[in-house]
Amino acid sequence: FKIDGQSEIKEPIGMFGGRLEANFHVVVGQVSSIKNIARCVKSSGIDFDGITLEPLASADAVLSREEKEAGVALIDIGGGTTDLAIFKDNIIRHTSVIPFGGNIITEDIKEGCSIIEKQAELLKIKFGSAWPGENKDNEIVSIPGLRGRDPKEISIKNLSKIIHARVVEIIEQVYMEIKNYGHEEQKKKLIAGIVLTGGGSQLKHLKQLVEYVTGMDTRIGLPNEHLAGNNSVEISNPTFATAVGLVMNSMEKRKNISVNKNQSEDEDDLENDDKDSNSIESKASQSIFEKFTEKIKTFLENAE
């Protein structure tokens, strides 16, 4: 933010000034896709309160404040897409959605091994590896044949080669986005490297392959970064990073609304003698963010 020409302000709330400026990271999407998501949620009997970009939700669950400050690239590998969010100085700097994820790897296995999708998914989960060099040529897995047909033998090394080819393609596209952000510049360098999350991040040897292709330090992000107590195995699974992040995001919004409401009530008590002044103060207290949020809510409510 910038207040009266003073730049590099991260939190303007509580400061005085006559002019507020800001640089925003705008995320856009297809209207039809957003409305379809809203309709799907509403049809299940759940109220639709808002919408958040997937990697931003995942980032809340798996990234530490120190990583966001140092500079980090979050890669969320889902079923249909691979999402990228880059943070530097605790500010979101770049986002991107790559239209390939775990499902395309399953499809490659299905076509390459001439098997059905269910078998391809099981092979990927149980025997899949992003690094084919570790597999021996004589390692074979046998899967049941269809409708009384003979079992089919699949080479583990060949399976890993199929997975490796597609994963390298996805990583290279993501790394291109990281370079487009300007990672190679000293001021924009991502000191904390890469954090992998999402269901696809559980692929064996993926971390090592990402480090090899990008040359950046990499870790697997689990959604228990900000959770207290003994977390269950299910919640600690990177598959649920986005879900945990959405819950955290919603709780933070409710907390901010509660704080703002209490502050408004205190101001009304202090300025109770001047009704005109109170009216002006009330209008001013509705920030541009609140107005924008109201418009989004109205748009989502009209999804049907």
Description of each model-found segment:
Residues 1-73, 116-118, 122-159, 259-304:
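Nucleotide/phosphate-binding catalytic cleft detector across ATP-hydrolyzing
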